[in-house]
């Protein structure tokens, strides 16, 4: 193994690059940390995602700056002069440099993988529950169950803990863990409430479970993230709300009152539904 | 060689022009606009646009498609009360989501309907919901929170009968609001949501608020 040695002539370049890299990296990381990376902190899960994305972006910034800086620096200082076509000096491998480079890269990638997997395995855990037929929803647990039902071209919501009342907007109480059950009545949709940090496929016959805990009062948007027909672009709702528990209680009571008119003919709350006919006239 | 290249280049240019023309014509093709007088809209829903009672379109490229007539592009004033009358001539298909059997977002939270009961006798009344299995169509403007189910004509009603549904709703500020049917009423398409459900001028429409 050859020893790591810097040629005398290269030292000014190395020192210059190192100083420049440190300064630009510090500036870059500080700048990156000022960016409000979505989804934000409206939910515990969203805050975790934002934190993870910020960490990953901050770690990637010095690498990005180093690569771009080397390219620009080389293009300026090591530019071929004159019109004569001459091969550059032969470049042989430098084992110490390669060892450092591979080791540092491996440590960074493994660290980021550990952070990402840990994040996925804890706060933003999702669970898909394919089933065979409609049945009753799993009851109990401290989380409030809310079912998201996609259909061309609107989302409706059923609250299992409130006699399965169905609503046209999604209201969630603050500081209360929620278990979202996402399904579809027709084709594939995708429930995307990015401020909540949730993006879940809505597939017919599938109960796609996501967990979310709102921690800030405010509104959020819901939209479909799966191309689903002529009004896909309109399959959105900006009236999602995170409200206080007392406001939620008032709202859900009103919804239950309104729902009474149709409750008898709406099927019981189930993980998913298979309404018929699949083809009109078939 | 030059001649062959010229023919090839000319062919490519012609194909490109044809493709652009086809796409352009497709995108420019829109149904006409119905302007309220000034806040009243009268529509008709039929099982086949070629065989409607009031505004038949026998020359339509899809005369057997279900549709709203005379058009699905509606222009109405902003921040106004719109009085709707829908003459519903189609039979029941049923809702995929029974929840839409309830009336939402209308003035008074209800609709007025003349219809025919199971014995074929004419009936009339204000309603806040209908049996979801007996829905023929819905008139829904999701961004305005307006969802109105339209009862299918009873099979025991006299031939050519029409259910007349009237209701009012308020518009918001200027903008283009899509409206749609939640009944999967496109016959012989998967989930009943193909063809006319995906095409402006049949079961898909725009409410232009200006």
Task: Enumerate the predicted regions with their spans.
Chain B
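Extracellular/periplasmic metallocenter environments
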Residues: 11, 20-29, 109-126, 130-210
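Extracytoplasmic entry segments of secretory-pathway proteins
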Residues: 1-129
């Amino acid at each position: 193994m050859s020893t790591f040695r810097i040629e005398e002539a290269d030292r000014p370049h190395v020192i210059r690059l190192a100083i420049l890299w440190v300064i630009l990296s510090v500036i870059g990381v500080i700048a990156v940390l000022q960016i409000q990376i979505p989804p934000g902190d409206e939910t515990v899960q969203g805050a975790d995602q934002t934190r993870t994305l910020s960490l990953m972006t901050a770690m990637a910034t010095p690498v990005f700056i180093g690569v771009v800086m080397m390219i620009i620096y080389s293009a300026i200082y090591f530019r071929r002069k004159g019109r004569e076509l001459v091969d550059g000096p032969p470049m042989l491998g430098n084992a110490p440099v390669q060892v450092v480079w591979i080791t540092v890269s491996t440590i960074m990638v493994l660290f980021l993988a550990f952070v990402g997997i840990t994040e996925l395995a804890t706060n933003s855990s999702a669970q898909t529950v394919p089933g065979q037929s409609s049945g009753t929803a799993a009851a109990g647990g401290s989380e409030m169950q809310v079912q998201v039902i996609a259909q061309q071209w609107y989302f409706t919501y059923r609250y299992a803990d409130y006699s399965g009342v169905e609503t046209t907007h999604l209201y969630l109480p603050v500081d209360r863990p929620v278990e979202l059950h996402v399904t579809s009545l027709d084709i594939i949709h995708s429930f995307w409430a990015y401020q909540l940090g949730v993006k879940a496929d809505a597939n017919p016959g599938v109960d796609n479970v996501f967990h979310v805990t709102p921690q800030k009062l405010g509104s959020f948007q819901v939209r479909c993230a799966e191309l689903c027909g002529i009004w896909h672009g309109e399959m959105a709702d900006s009236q999602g709300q995170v409200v206080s528990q007392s406001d939620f209680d008032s709202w859900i009571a009103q919804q239950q009152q309104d729902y009474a008119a149709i409750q008898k003919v709406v099927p019981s709350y189930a993980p998913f539904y298979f309404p018929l006919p699949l083809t009109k006239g078939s | 060689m030059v001649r062959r290249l010229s023919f090839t280049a000319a062919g490519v240019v012609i194909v490109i022009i044809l493709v652009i023309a086809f796409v352009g014509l497709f995108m420019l093709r829109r149904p006409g606009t119905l302007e309220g007088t000034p806040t009243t809209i009268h529509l008709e829903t039929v099982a086949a646009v070629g065989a409607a009672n009031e505004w038949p379109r026998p020359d339509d490229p899809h005369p057997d498609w279900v549709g709203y007539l005379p058009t699905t592009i509606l222009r109405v004033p902003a921040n106004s009360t719109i009085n709707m009358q829908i003459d519903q001539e189609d039979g029941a298909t049923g809702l995929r989501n029974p929840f839409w059997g309830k009336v939402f977002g209308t003035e008074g939270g209800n609709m007025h309907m003349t219809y025919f009961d199971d014995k074929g006798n004419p009936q009339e009344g204000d309603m806040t919901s209908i049996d979801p299995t007996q829905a023929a169509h819905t008139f829904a403007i999701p961004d305005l929170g307006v969802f109105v189910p339209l009862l299918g004509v009873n099979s025991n009603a006299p031939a050519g009968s029409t259910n007349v549904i009237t209701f009012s709703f308020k518009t918001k500020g200027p903008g283009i609001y899509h409206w749609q049917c939640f009944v999967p009423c496109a016959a012989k398409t998967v989930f009943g949501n193909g063809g006319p459900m995906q095409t402006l001028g049949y079961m898909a429409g725009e409410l232009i608020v200006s």
